[in-house]
């Protein structure tokens, strides 16, 4: 074994020793940008799709969510390779499984609510439950911006749920209330997460350049 190979082997052993592959959580923030795009598309096309056909709407939403998870999975594997991690860590699997189960539950709820044309309620339920997922991500990654964003989304979704229920605003697809909830969701699940992810990427780049 050459001297260079020996040095590389020692570096790899040190890295493996320092990185707990069971609990470590490397994260590719490009996934946030992908989910932001999907959130915008889903928010805008979900209601027309379900109005066209319940089956078509459910299939379209399931397809978009599946695309999101496939892309995020590939991005996760990419960032894991930089830490010599061949598979997902336990924390990554935990978060991914939670988001996937939440998404399946949401698709079922959405289909049921769409049968009764409760479109405003559908949008708010997505905001509430996906924000719970972002709260978990913020907690695991120790990113206060994610947890604060999630708390804000949860609070505003609960407020709108109370207002919508009190004034009976959930039914229909052409109300001002629905437009308001769609705008809130686009900001809360697309604009805000993408902005936070971009900020985190810049911080990682700056810290990386400083350490060189």
Predicted feature residues:
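N-terminal juxtamembrane cytosolic/stromal segments of multi-pass membrane proteins
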Residues: 1-29
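C-terminal ends of transmembrane helices
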Residues: 20, 72-88, 134-141, 191-198
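Selected alpha-helical membrane-embedding segments in polytopic membrane proteins
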Residues: 25-112
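Membrane-embedded alpha-helical transmembrane segments of multi-pass integral membrane proteins
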Residues: 38, 42, 67-68, 109, ...
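Transmembrane helix-loop junctions in multipass membrane proteins, especially transporters and channels
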Residues: 47, 51-55, 77-85, 115-119, ...
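Structural signature of hydrophobic alpha-helical transmembrane segments
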Residues: 58-67, 115-128, 180-184
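Membrane-proximal helix-loop-helix units in multi-pass membrane proteins
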Residues: 95-150, 155-156
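Terminal transmembrane helical module of multi-pass membrane proteins
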Residues: 136-212
């Amino acid at each position: 074994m050459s001297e260079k190979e020996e040095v590389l082997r020692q570096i790899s052993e040190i890295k493996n020793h320092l990185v707990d592959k069971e609990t470590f959580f490397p994260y590719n923030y490009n996934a946030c940008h992908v989910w932001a795009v999907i959130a915008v598309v889903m928010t805008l096309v979900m209601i027309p799709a379900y109005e066209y056909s319940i089956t078509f709407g459910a299939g379209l939403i399931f397809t978009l969510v599946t695309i999101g998870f496939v892309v995020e999975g590939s991005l996760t594997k990419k960032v894991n390779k930089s830490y010599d991690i061949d598979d997902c860590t336990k924390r990554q699997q935990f978060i991914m499984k939670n988001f996937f189960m939440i998404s399946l539950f949401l698709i079922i709820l959405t289909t049921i609510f769409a049968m009764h044309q409760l479109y405003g309620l559908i949008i708010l339920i997505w905001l509430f439950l996906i924000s719970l997922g972002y709260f978990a991500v913020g907690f695991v990654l120790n990113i206060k911006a994610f947890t604060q964003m999630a708390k804000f989304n949860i609070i505003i979704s609960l407020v709108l749920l109370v207002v919508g229920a009190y004034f009976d605003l959930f039914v229909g697809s052409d109300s001002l209330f629905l437009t308001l909830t769609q705008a809130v969701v686009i900001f809360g699940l697309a604009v805000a997460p993408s902005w936070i992810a971009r900020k985190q990427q810049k911080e990682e780049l700056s810290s990386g350049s400083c350490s060189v």
